[in-house]
Amino acid sequence: AYIIQPNRKNYKAPNIVKILENEKITKIGHYLRYDVSGLEYFLKCNIQNIFDTKIASKLCRTYTQNHGLKDLVLEFCGKKLDKRLGSSDWNKSLSELTDAQLQYCSNDVIYLHKIKDDLLKMLVREKRLKLYESSIQFLKTRIKLDQSGFTEDIFQH
């Protein structure tokens, strides 16, 4: 796992943008709505080929209401994530973050490949892969709505 921090003065990160926009590289994350929105806004890019473990989990793990990353790591990897550092002050430079904060960041993503693989198998088994793919397309639309100032659900009555 890599921990990155773009230059806050101009947010130029051309090498990262190349990766984010590369359709051949899958970007895996958990609850990507705000991460993708922020990265696209600040880096002026269009992120391609994302896999959102929370959306996949909600579509294929219908036997539970627990779809947090902590729950997925426990079920698929047999590990307990310590989420206490999640509410830390993250508005610091990388050099100011503690070793515990840096470890927390890497722990948050190190299990995502296995979780993605297992969720993909479940989506196929449950015949929900196409529904997942449509949901990801809509996620991109939802992000565009967020970026345009429509923070409320426009489909809500």
Regions of interest found by a model, annotated:
Residues 1-122:
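Conserved DEDDh/DEDDy metal-dependent 3′-5′ exonuclease domain
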Residues 91, 98-157:
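Mixed-charge, glycine-rich, non-catalytic linkers/tails in nucleic-acid processing enzymes
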